[in-house]
A protein has these predicted regions:
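Short, charged/polar low-complexity linear motifs in solvent-exposed/disordered segments
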Residues: 18-19, 43-44, 136-139, 163-164, ...
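Intrinsically disordered, low-complexity segments enriched in small/polar residues
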Residues: 22, 58, 140, 159-160
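Mobile, glycine-enriched helix-loop/loop "lid" segments at the mouths of ligand-binding/catalytic clefts
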Residues: 28-43, 48, 143-146, 150-168
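Hydrophobic transmembrane alpha-helix bundles
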Residues: 37-47, 63-73, 118-129, 161-171
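Contiguous beta-strand/loop segments that form the cofactor/metal-binding neighborhood of enzyme cores
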Residues: 70-155
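C-terminal helical cap and adjacent loop that interface with cofactors, partners, or active-site loops
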Residues: 116, 135, 145, 163-176
Length: 176
């Protein structure tokens, strides 16, 4: 799998800032990748998209989207996942017959990192209206939002009240 989120300039800059102590020791984080689902952008759009077929895809939103955020958070934090818990479910997506699809359309994982930080990763195919491809990292000296602000790639809110803005690039999107 090509881990394309590592190539995003804001993720590289965030990694550099975190390693330099810009937000102190990382305590917790949340990372999200959610959109309206592959039927809205795939080469074979609609309710018969291969992503929904368990015999072809095996897994859903977790494998499609979550794998990228799982890799990205380890890259940005410079830490490895040592323990995880997950809930995968199908809440809304239906196939051409009207039945719930055979793979997950939503997944939430709790990660424990080898540096002691804990956080969540959410992958969803049922974020209707606007894609969310953001990460927020909470440290002892501040909070870093990565692609969480519509105007700035990275925003760091410092414990002392200061705010730093970094404009590197826009996040990749599946939006039409």
């Amino acid at each position: 799998i090509g881990q394309n989120q590592r190539l995003a300039k804001a993720h590289s800059k965030a990694r550099e800032l975190i390693a330099s102590g810009a937000i102190g020791k990382v305590l917790t984080f949340r990372t999200i990748f959610g959109h309206g689902g592959p039927e809205t952008w795939s080469i074979d759009p609609g309710s018969n998209v291969w992503f929904f077929d368990r015999s072809k895809a095996a897994m859903g939103a977790l494998a499609d989207l979550g794998i990228h955020k799982t890799d990205m958070i380890q890259y940005v934090l410079g830490a490895k996942i040592v323990k995880t818990q997950a809930v995968l479910t199908t809440l809304d997506k239906r196939d051409a017959t009207g039945s719930l699809i055979g793979v997950d359309d939503n997944a939430i994982c709790i990660f424990e990192m080898d540096n002691g930080a804990i956080g969540t990763m959410t992958a969803s195919w049922s974020y209707y209206g606007r894609e969310d491809n953001s990460t927020v990292v909470y440290g002892t000296e501040g909070i870093m939002g990565i692609y969480a602000d519509p105007q700035h790639s990275i925003v760091v809110h410092k414990k002392d009240g200061g705010t730093l803005y970094y404009d590197t690039d826009a996040i990749q999107t599946n939006a039409s």
